[in-house]
């Protein structure tokens, strides 16, 4: 599974989205993706890293292997990359990208090496500007010219650009906040695992998890008794039970319990330490 809007955007552009499989743990297997591209001959390949909704981070070496061995343009969607553990790059550092140590092995360091690579980043996640809809792409001149032909004129308004510029110039102010999110994320993942949940490896600002074994059975039974619904599988019912219970307690999480590849899963976004504690107490 990956970001659901890829398919929507493909449909809007009269294209067909062809998904490639991830590993059972949610990682990208370079060999599988390369073989997929050789077989399907896609016009464009998209890799979400870290992946949404599982949270997995794939190492730079794996991403480079894909870019180097496929013929089509590649979009590396790094919307959540700031949450991956790694060193930051000062905004005043103007050295070439391939000379920088970028956060958690971002593929930005490969832009000068591969002409088919585009790296997409956003201000929506780590910097909280989702409502302003400001993202950016970095790539070789040739592939960026192709992207430019598809963009509408005036696609980013002046106010959004002004806010994004100011934020980027002061992004050091966000470092402690991002560190806190990472710390709270790791605490939540560890505690959920201690409670008996299966937790997906995550390098984002969210944690995806589901019940397993006896916990699945007990939650499914509770769902059937409370809602008098025996139509769901135990795994789906366990996820629905948790989702409904949290909703009743004014806690909104993302419900993936009916998803074919994330059966029974919920995704919770990291909040303040107090909010995170409340969620864990309810669970």
Please provide the spans of the model-predicted regions.
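Short acidic/glycine-enriched loop/turn segments that link adjacent beta-strands
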Residues: 131, 203-204, 260-264
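Conserved PLP-binding catalytic core of the aspartate aminotransferase-like
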Residues: 181-182, 186, 192-249, 266, ...
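PLP-dependent aminotransferase class I/II
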Residues: 5, 116-193, 197-200
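Active-site pre-lysine segment of PLP-dependent enzymes
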Residues: 27-40, 53-74, 78-124, 142
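Structural motif
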Residues: 44-48, 75, 136-138
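PLP-dependent aminotransferase-like
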Residues: 1-47
């Amino acid at each position: 599974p990956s970001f659901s809007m890829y398919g929507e955007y493909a449909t809007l552009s009269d294209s067909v989205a062809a998904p490639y499989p991830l590993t059972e743990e949610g990682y990208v297997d370079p060999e599988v993706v390369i073989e997929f591209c050789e077989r399907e001959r896609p016009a464009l390949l998209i890799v979400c890293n870290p992946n949404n909704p599982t949270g997995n981070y794939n190492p730079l070496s794996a991403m480079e292997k894909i870019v180097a061995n496929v013929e089509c343009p590649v979009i590396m969607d790094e919307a959540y990359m700031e949450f991956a553990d790694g060193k930051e790059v000062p905004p005043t550092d103007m050295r070439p990208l391939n000379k920088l140590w970028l956060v958690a092995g971002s593929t930005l360091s490969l832009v000068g090496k591969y002409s088919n690579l585009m790296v997409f980043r956003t201000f929506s996640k780590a910097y909280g500007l989702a409502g302003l809809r400001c993202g950016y792409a970095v790539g070789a001149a040739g592939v960026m010219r192709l992207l430019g032909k598809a963009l509408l004129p005036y696609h980013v308004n002046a106010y959004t650009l002004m806010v994004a510029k100011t934020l980027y110039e002061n992004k050091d102010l966000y470092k402690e906040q991002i560190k806190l999110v990472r710390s709270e994320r790791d605490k939540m993942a560890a505690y959920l695992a201690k409670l008996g949940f299966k937790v997906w490896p995550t390098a984002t600002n969210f944690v995806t998890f589901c019940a397993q074994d006896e916990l699945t059975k007990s939650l499914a039974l509770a769902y059937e008794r409370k809602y008098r619904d025996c139509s769901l599988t135990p795994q789906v019912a366990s996820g629905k039970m948790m989702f409904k219970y949290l909703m009743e307690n004014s806690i909104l999480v993302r419900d993936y319990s009916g998803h074919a590849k994330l059966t029974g899963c919920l995704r919770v976004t990291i909040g303040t330490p107090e909010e995170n504690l409340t969620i864990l107490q309810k669970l």
